[in-house]
């Protein structure tokens, strides 16, 4: 469980880094994250992408996440993004959804290349969401770390969440590269 101080720091960092940005800026930041993942995964073997890598702690990552593979990280990221898309749609319809316990997204089993198809399909839905939905709902959903978020705040969370895991994917691949270079 995070301390009050950690939660306040995370909230301030979120709102300064993403929450006060325009929808267009967050969309562009999300798109750059997808491009970065494409670049990181280019020409990396499936064996490496499905092999867990034990990485150093990073802000925003739970201890469980530190031992995931790239594919597991992508599966988790996609699951969270699908849930946020659903919450945004509910808020925009005038509903008041409940996010529930976010730790449920920390349980990811072994994953393979099949996760990429859904990940990229949902990423495209996220990139085009502002063209389809106004993101003006006044209704809110409570996030235990970031507080009360409307649909625009949730859209900002998509970009923030993606970049959190871009750095995780980069660290996993660097860990595998170090291991490979030691074996040579």
Where are these regions (language model features)?
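Aromatic-glycine hotspot motif
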Residues: 1-184
């Amino acid at each position: 469980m995070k301390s009050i101080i950690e939660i306040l720091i995370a909230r301030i960092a979120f709102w300064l880094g993403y929450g006060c940005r325009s929808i267009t800026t967050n969309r562009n930041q999300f798109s750059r994250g997808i491009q970065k993942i494409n670049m990181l995964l280019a020409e990396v073997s499936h064996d490496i992408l499905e092999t867990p890598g034990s990485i150093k702690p990073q802000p925003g990552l739970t201890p469980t996440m530190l031992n995931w593979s790239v594919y597991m990280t992508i599966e988790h990221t996609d699951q969270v993004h699908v849930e946020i898309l659903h919450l945004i749609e509910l808020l925009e319809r005038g509903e008041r959804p409940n996010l529930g316990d976010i730790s449920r997204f920390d349980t990811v089993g072994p994953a393979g290349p099949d996760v990429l198809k859904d990940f990229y399909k949902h990423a495209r839905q996220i990139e085009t969401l502002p063209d389809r939905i106004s993101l003006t709902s006044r209704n809110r959903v409570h996030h235990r770390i970031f507080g009360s978020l409307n649909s625009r705040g949730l859209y900002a969370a998509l970009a923030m969440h993606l970049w959190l895991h871009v750095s995780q994917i980069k660290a996993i691949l660097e860990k595998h590269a170090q291991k490979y270079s030691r074996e040579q």
